[in-house]
């Protein structure tokens, strides 16, 4: 269902907010600016949203590999690649994960065909010779710089997570990214002995019955952008 134009929030919200939000997903006046067709734009952006239920159709190893093979091409600072993915498939591993999820996220995490735990590697700079071979010596810039590496790892890991969600959609699946969990508990459970910091958990699969909440408003272009 497409809802066009501005939402009227005069009752629950101050009227000055109305001009700043909309859920217009038709964008007819920008149609000539896109190189992707409408179906592709809907798949990736306009009709895509967080899935909360899934069918029991299995997510294959081939699909998981395909997701990463797209994710890895997204740009990052200095081509660093701090994202690490833990696929939680087995019932035993899923049970261990669920106990670290917030109450509202437990049932859907337990039921999803596949769950990905996304983390960033705090020692990502060790791979400089692989991802920056023409200037591998720059690894030394980050030796002993724990705080700087953590900031860069988190920032670029989150950026890679956005590519990851798009890649999930590209293989015909739906993503349900979540932030309600005990990150330290998940790290102790799955990343002991590794330099990884969990920052997102993503349920993956074919969307099930009543998978979507209604589309919430998005801030308008004129409110978000400035030209200088």
Residue ranges with predicted function:
Residues 6-9, 13-228:
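Acidic, surface-exposed loops and disordered segments
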């Amino acid at each position: 269902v497409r809802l066009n134009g501005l939402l009227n929030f005069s009752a629950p919200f101050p009227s000055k907010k109305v001009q700043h939000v909309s859920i217009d997903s038709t964008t007819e006046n920008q149609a000539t600016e896109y190189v992707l067709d409408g179906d592709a734009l809907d798949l990736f952006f306009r009709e895509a949203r967080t899935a909360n239920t899934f069918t029991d159709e299995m997510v294959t190893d081939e699909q998981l590999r395909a997701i990463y093979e797209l994710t890895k091409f997204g740009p990052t600072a200095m081509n660093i690649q701090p994202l690490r993915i833990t696929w939680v498939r087995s019932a035993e591993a899923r049970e261990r994960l669920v106990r670290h999820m917030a109450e509202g996220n437990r049932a859907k995490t337990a039921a999803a065909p596949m769950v990905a735990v996304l983390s960033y590697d705090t020692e990502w700079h060790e791979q400089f010779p692989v991802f920056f071979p023409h200037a591998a010596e720059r690894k030394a810039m980050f030796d002993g710089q724990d705080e700087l590496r953590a900031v860069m790892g988190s920032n670029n890991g989150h950026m890679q997570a956005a590519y990851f969600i798009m890649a999930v959609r590209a293989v015909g699946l739906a993503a349900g990214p979540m932030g309600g969990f005990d990150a330290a508990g998940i790290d102790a459970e799955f990343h002991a002995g590794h330099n990884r910091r969990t920052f997102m958990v993503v349920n993956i699969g074919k969307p099930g019955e009543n998978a979507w909440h209604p589309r919430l408003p998005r801030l308008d272009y004129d409110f978000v952008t400035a030209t200088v």
